[in-house]
């Protein structure tokens, strides 16, 4: 039978999982489906006590992924790089909880890039500048993507949009580099 989705918490606490390859382009990936850290309660600050760290270092997805990625879908991912896809629908925060993420790669053939709110909340503050390739017409950045410190735009006609819903600060971008022209 064809897999239509991966349920919420499906691989929860599977710390030995190293690679996820999604071949289906319309599957729904549930909340915390790959929350692979093994925890034992919470510390005094309310943070989970991790007793066995995740080993999930590679996520492979179809280029045109038309499925639904729910909140914290890949929160067990401990890789340092993620290749963005031509997403058309997903919930906010699907990369939330990826604390080792340092680099987001945007393919050159994308026309629009939509970074949902809360997507990069928990990434380290060492997240490298986002480099938007030439040919991208529009970039939409949702609320609370706190760790985006710099965006480098390679195209002369790329438009950067932000979401400032309900008066909240959308992002704390310190620097935007644009190609002259």
Question: Which sequence ranges carry the predicted segments?
Answer:
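Structural signature of tandem-repeat unit edges
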Residues: 1-5, 15-28, 39-68, 76-89, ...
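Consensus positions within tandem repeat domains that build extended binding/scaffold surfaces
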Residues: 7-10, 31-33, 72-73, 93-94, ...
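Short, aromatic/basic amphipathic alpha-helical patches
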Residues: 72-73, 162-169
